[in-house]
Amino acid sequence: MVLLLFLVLFFVPESVVCQRPNPNGVEFNTSGNMYTSGSAYINNNGLIRLTNSTPQTTGQVFYNDQLRFKNSVNGTVSSFSTTFVFSIEFHNGIYGGYGIAFVICPTRDLSPTFPTTYLGLFNRSNMGDPKNHIVAVELDTKVDQQFEDKDANHVGIDINTLVSDTVALAGYYMDNGTFRSLLLNSGQPMQIWIEYDSKQKQINVTLHPLYVPKPKIPLLSLEKDLSPYLLELMYVGFTSTTGDLTASHYILGWTFKMNGTTPDIDPSRLPKIPRYNQPWIQSPNGILTISLTVSGVIILIILSLSLWLFLKRKKLLEVLEDWEVQFGPHRFAFKDLHIATKGFKDTEVLGKGGFGKVYKGTLPVSNVEIAVKMVSHDSRQGMREFIAEIATIGRLRHPNLVRLQGYCRHKGELYLVYDCMAKGSLDKFLYHQQTGNLDWSQRFKIIKDVASGLYYLHQQWVQVIIHRDIKPANILLDANMNAKLGDFGLAKLCDHGTDPQTSHVAGTLGYISPELSRTGKASTRSDVFAFGIVMLEIACGRKPILPRASQREMVLTDWVLECWENEDIMQVLDHKIGQEYVEEQAALVLKLGLFCSHPVAAIRPNMSSVIQLLDSVAQLPHNLLDIVQTREVHRGTEISGEAADSPESCSIAPLTFTESFVSHGR
């Protein structure tokens, strides 16, 4: 397929022809190829100004021709990549405007749409309508509770609505993982990259200052197939709005490419941003504005003094700790959490873990359901380390991981705010009759969901994350019975290919691997061991150790292995499943569970191999029974963590497993 490449290079003079050959396809520039509407215009230097000093207005610019995003009406969306340089400058020293949105839409005429908070994309009646076929990335500089905004300086990915699928504070990640925030309406030029991978079904958004190289870690990453949302032919462009207060929204340069990485923009060739013209000072409106400003300053001074006196008398002083500088934008007000949980009443307790109680709640105004974990601030140093982990893990976004929304500190207590899982934890379904029974298809899907989340932690994120406490109580189910791995209170981080540091043995009895109990060194293989136990537990409907059971059935793995040796492995299945199960799937789960929970760490598969086996892409070794019967630790294979997570292969004919830490697209 011929690649379509257009370069909207705004520094190219208008006399240049509008189309010319290019080694990568067809190249375009601004001459005659841009469609403007509303307050938008393009000056002689190619600078786009979307909005001006006119209040309650919308400015939009689109590439004049439609682009083919699909090969057919029902086809899949092709990969695409775009980058642009923008600047947002407020007027008269007052923050105004509502930001910029890069938009992919089926028409250049989005009317009737509203300015202000709707960014010229939607109106009240068509918000959330699947017929919109709009995908946008918003650079939002205003807070609007109806769109679940948490701050006035964020970046979000929007699909058919301004309630973002995923959102983050504006900023960028350095190579060492440190987060640096940016102020979108600072007037400084910034560059943003929006890249969609059709194979991974993933869209990444990366923001950075103009003269800083593109970061390796994206600000936003969303796994979503865009094929149901985009049509075969679509327009691409920008939209921006103002309210009663105004701002200038500029696009200095823009490139876009289908099926490849778009070329970078040369900052030295970008047009200059003009200073905002201020003839208003000499006008009656200008005099009135100055008078109101002076009066406002006097009132502000009086209010500031009153506030200072109030804070001086306040007994409780919240000190901003180091870790909060990075995680601060996600801080919740204690008042909101207190209202949401009805004053942290015992009737709202969902459960109690190793770090504290978990409460259910509903946030005021937005009515979003949340789960709040209360953590005692017993050890300052311990809490600092714990939150350093949480701050990093809070950036994770995966459909099979419970999302950490933010935190709150109040009177020495720490509160972690998570998405609320409507169905609760998996152990309640396995062991509490009143919760309801799980059929085989639900159990198999839960196993695959947890495997997907664990694979992301081990091999797909920029760092290796070792969960260290995988068990049914930490597997949560949403309203649609989708499983999500949660409770990262014991999780550890390390770089790909490095050796996790030894620490105290953490986890739950029955799920701790032999090498972890001996050395105290957790690894991805010790997580795989616990996952294998959980697989058996889901299939058999019983705990890994039953002290009061017969000697034969006391240890789950021993019992399953014995039944396999006696060629009657199906007898271990949970009797509540009945006869409604797929025998091949059940056998795979039981045998793979024994494989993953093998006492020798080096023999266990990694999670990418587990995914292949569960998806029937690969087959279990034909001699797997002989392998799992080898219960002793052979010389040279007593693995604690180093060898288990090294990039070397562990070959088990006819299937070869390789621990390969790959950072996809990072």
Curated annotation (Swiss-Prot):
Q: Which reactions fall under this protein's catalytic activity?
A: L-seryl-[protein] + ATP = O-phospho-L-seryl-[protein] + ADP + H(+); L-threonyl-[protein] + ATP = O-phospho-L-threonyl-[protein] + ADP + H(+)
Quote the EC number: 2.7.11.1
Q: What are the UniProt keywords, alphabetically?
A: ATP-binding, Cell membrane, Glycoprotein, Kinase, Lectin, Membrane, Nucleotide-binding, Receptor, Serine/threonine-protein kinase, Signal, Transferase, Transmembrane, Transmembrane helix
Lineage: superkingdom: Eukaryota
- The residue spans the entry assigns to the Extracellular side of the membrane are as follows 19-289
Pfam families, per database record: Lectin_legB, Pkinase
Where's it found, cell-wise?
A: Cell membrane
Parts of the chain on the Cytoplasmic side: 311-666
- Molecular-function annotations in GO: ATP binding; carbohydrate binding; protein serine kinase activity; protein serine/threonine kinase activity
Major site of localization recorded for this protein: membrane
List the active site.
469 (proton acceptor)
Q: Which GO terms describe its cellular component?
A: plasma membrane
Residue ranges occupied by any Protein kinase domain in the UniProt entry: 344-625
Q: Where does ATP bind?
A: 350-358, 373
According to the record, which residues are glycosylated?
A: 29, 74, 123, 176, 204, 259
Q: For this UniProt entry, which residues form the secretion signal?
A: 1-18
**If you read the UniProt record, what top EC class would you report for this enzyme, in one word?**
transferase
Q: How does it sit in the membrane?
A: Single-pass type I membrane protein
Q: Where is this region: Legume-lectin like?
A: 27-257
- Transmembrane segment boundaries: 290-310
Q: Which family does it belong to?
A: In the C-terminal section; belongs to the protein kinase superfamily. Ser/Thr protein kinase family. In the N-terminal section; belongs to the leguminous lectin family.
Q: What is this protein called?
A: Putative L-type lectin-domain containing receptor kinase V.1
Task: Look up and give the organism this protein is from.
Answer: Arabidopsis thaliana (Mouse-ear cress)
Q: Which gene encodes it?
A: LECRK51
